Amino acid sequence: MGSNDLINEAYDDSEVVGEERESKSAWMKRWYQLLTSPLDLQLVINEKLEMINWDAYAKSLAKPLGNFLTILFFIIRLLQDNLIKPNYYKLNVKSGAFDLSKSNKLKEFDYLWEISSSFQNSNQFYAFQSWYFVTLRFLNNLFRFTIFILLSLNLYVSCKFMFGYFKTYNLFHLKKEFNSPNLTKHNLKDLSKEYYEDIYKQSLWSMLKHFFRGSRDDGPHVNQNEDEIFFQLRKWIPTNFMINLFVSFSPTAIVFLSFSDVSFTSAIAIVFHQYILDYIITKRFQRSVDDDLILSSAALQEYEDKHIMARINQCSNIDTLSSAMGTRSKTPRIFTTHSLCGEEIREVYNYEKREFEALPKMTESVPGSRETRIKDYGGISQVSDNQSHPIGFHYSPRMSPYYRDKVLDNNLAQSSSNENLEKGGAFLPNQDQNRPSKSLSPLRKTPLSARQKRFEGSEFNVLNKNDINSILRSPKKKKNYHKR
């Protein structure tokens, strides 16, 4: 063996020693933390338990565990009534109660000593020294301890199921009081910190009552305003895991087995009881609650589809109508509500006064003649019947002066174009001779033959048909009216 091998072995031994020291120091730190701060360990254990999804193990763990505990309690009670109870006297008789060998008076007489010794050997000595009765005595003590543990566990499960799963809801928008013992009225002052400071200043008994009962109830609240009152609902919501554990390890079966003489025929009653309780609570009542939840979800979805979504879609369709100035803002600034009589009220928010103001009622727009609609757009002057204007376009109040000037300019341009067309005597092929032109372009003011000659002699004759169509369909081209 060389020197290098010796060095490697020494190095390996040092690593093992270092790991052992680290493990010992880690165990020492853990024991020190356990002894000095047990609440931290309890907090860690509670966090680990809360992170487990117990409802996922309701069918696979809770129900088999409850049935196993019930069967175990039945077997123990069966052995107690049929094995321990017949030998109760032999197991509980004291060994020194009639021990005649300890009597000094009997020792003086030989014949009495012989009788006492024979009696001792035949009865008491055999009863207390036999392995059979020693085993029964051990089993009796074990059964008592196990029954005490099972009764305590069943009591904990029952109390946890009936009193340990409550959630409190504060209902601030509920106005109608329902006849429910879990619904109570409270004052809004109970939510403030001053209320808890007042409780801390009271006696120990008042603090204990608040701890077990919850927040106080100030009575019927007759003289208080509705805005100062809110309802508090204390709802019982047990978990699915605890429901299955309570049904399979029910206190009714435990009480029945505790106060009755258990035999093999009692197993039929226990099996029937377990099946009926599981069928009523798990397969009927709990599924009924799930069905009510489905109906509530369906009703809420129907209300959302028929009322909320329909109104949102209608408002979005109105907001996204195309106009000359682009789409409108999607932020609703006018709010529509209804009074108690069913009348529609339109309100707008005033940022200066910081309050809503009602808008004046507007009559429904009835489609009238073209001249009537033109008059409505800002007091435009009268026009003749042979003039055409865009129909079906609603101008905003902000742009009404702009479009009023455009309409007047359009009227003047159309009148001048009619005079030029009458003098020229040339019309487009697809143009009605009795109908004036709607365009303001200077090309429409000249005859068709002159325009064709001017175009052929210009530099634009090299453009093909596709280039002309792309120019005419350019997005920069503005339309001041809609075609019907």
From Swiss-Prot:
Coiled coil: none
GO CC annotations, alphabetized: nuclear membrane
The keyword Membrane belongs to this UniProt entry's keyword annotation: yes
Keyword Lyase annotated: no
A Gene Ontology BP annotation from the UniProt entry: maintenance of rDNA
Compartment(s) where it occurs, according to its Swiss-Prot or TrEMBL record: Nucleus membrane
Keywords assigned by UniProt, alphabetized: Membrane, Nucleus, Phosphoprotein, Transmembrane, Transmembrane helix
Membrane-spanning parts: 145-165, 252-272
Top-level taxon of origin: Eukaryota
Segments for region (Disordered): 416-457
Principal location class: nucleus
Modified residues (Phosphoserine): S3, S417, S474
Protein topology in the membrane: Multi-pass membrane protein
Comp. bias regions, Polar residues: 430-440
Protein role: Member of a perinuclear network that controls recombination at multiple loci to maintain genome stability. Required for rDNA repeat stability.
Family named by the database record: Belongs to the NUR1 family.
Subunit structure: Interacts with CSM1.
Record protein name field: Nuclear rim protein 1
Organism: Saccharomyces cerevisiae (strain RM11-1a)
Lineage of source species: Eukaryota, Fungi, Dikarya, Ascomycota, Saccharomycotina
Recorded name of the encoding gene: NUR1
